[in-house]
Curated annotation (Swiss-Prot):
Organism placement in taxonomy: Eukaryota, Metazoa, Chordata, Craniata, Vertebrata
Residues annotated for Mg(2+) binding in this entry: 40, 51, 146, 148
Name assigned to this protein: Isopentenyl-diphosphate Delta-isomerase 1
Underlying gene: Idi1
UniProt cross-references to PANTHER family, sorted A to Z: ISOPENTENYL-DIPHOSPHATE DELTA-ISOMERASE, ISOPENTENYL-DIPHOSPHATE DELTA-ISOMERASE 1
Annotated positions of the N6-acetyllysine modification: 176
Protein family: Belongs to the IPP isomerase type 1 family.
Residues bound to substrate: 36, 70, 74, 87
Length: 227
C-alpha cells in the first residue's frame, strides 16, 4: 500500500484512519477488511478497492431534514455540505451483521452519537428505515477519495443535538425549498456539496421526502443503484 504523509492533517481525524472498514465486491459481498486510510486513497480506489458505507437522512417531526457542513478538519470533502450523517460500518461482529442491515444501523447509531452528539437512548434501530443502496466513486483531491456502496437510512424523530466541532462545522434543519436553494448555490460555486449528497439529491431525495409517511414502496434491498 502507498505511504502517505499525514503529519499535516488533524490528529484526531488521522487516528480514525486506523479504523477497519468492510471491503466488498461490487455486489456488496464482504471480501475482507482494510483501514479507513487505505480505503480512501485514490491509488487504491483506482485498483478497485471498494468499501461499505451509509448515509443517514434525519428528519424532525416538522419533516425538515438535518443538514451538516463537514468540518475543515475532515480529510475527505472538508467544508462540504451533506446529509445528516455519513460514515462506515466497521469490520467487527456487531457491524458486520447483514440481516435487515442491522450492522449498518448499529454503525449509524454509533456515528450519530460521535458526530452529532445524539444520545444513544434516543436512537432506536427499529425506527430507522433502510431504503436501498447506492454505488458511487468520487475524488476529494489528488490523494483522497471515496468508493462506496452506500446504505440509505431514513429516521424521523426529534433528537437532542450536541455536535462535535472536529466533525461538524455547522448544521441546520431545512425544508425542501431550502435544499433546492442549496443545490442552486452549489451549482453556481457559492458552496460545496459532498458528491454522494448531490447524487442522492439529484435523483431520489425529493421523491422519498414527499413520501415520509409511506416509504415502503421505495424500499429496494435487491438493487444497487449505480449512479
Amino acid at each position: 500500500m502507498p505511504e502517505i504523509n499525514t503529519s499535516h492533517l488533524d490528529e484526531k481525524q488521522v487516528q480514525l484512519l486506523a479504523e477497519m472498514c468492510i471491503l466488498i465486491d461490487e455486489n456488496d459481498n464482504k471480501i475482507g477488511a482494510d483501514t479507513k486510510k487505505n480505503c480512501h486513497l485514490n491509488e487504491n480506489i483506482d485498483k478497485g478497492l471498494l468499501h461499505r458505507a451509509f448515509s443517514v437522512f434525519l428528519f424532525n417531526t416538522e419533516n425538515k431534514l438535518l443538514l451538516q457542513q463537514r468540518s475543515d478538519a475532515k480529510i475527505t470533502f472538508p467544508g462540504c455540505f451533506t446529509n445528516s450523517c455519513c460514515s462506515h460500518p466497521l469490520s467487527n461482529p456487531g457491524e458486520l451483521e447483514e440481516n435487515n442491515a442491522i450492522g449498518v444501523k448499529r454503525a449509524a447509531k454509533r456515528r450519530l452519537k460521535a458526530e452529532l452528539g445524539i444520545p444513544l437512548e434516543e436512537v432506536d434501530l427499529n425506527e430507522m428505515d433502510y431504503l436501498t443502496r447506492i454505488y458511487y466513486k468520487a475524488q476529494s483531491d489528488g490523494i483522497w477519495g471515496e468508493h462506496e456502496v452506500d446504505y440509505i437510512l431514513f429516521l424521523r424523530k426529534n433528537v437532542t443535538l450536541n455536535p462535535d466541532p472536529n466533525e461538524i462545522k455547522s448544521y441546520c434543519y431545512v425544508s425542501k425549498e431550502e435544499v433546492r436553494e442549496i443545490l442552486k448555490k452549489a451549482a453556481s460555486g457559492e458552496i460545496k456539496l459532498t458528491p454522494w449528497f448531490k447524487i442522492i439529491a439529484d435523483t431520489f431525495l425529493f421523491k422519498w421526502w414527499d413520501n415520509l409517511n409511506h416509504l415502503s414502496p421505495f424500499v429496494d434491498h435487491e438493487k444497487i443503484h449505480r449512479l
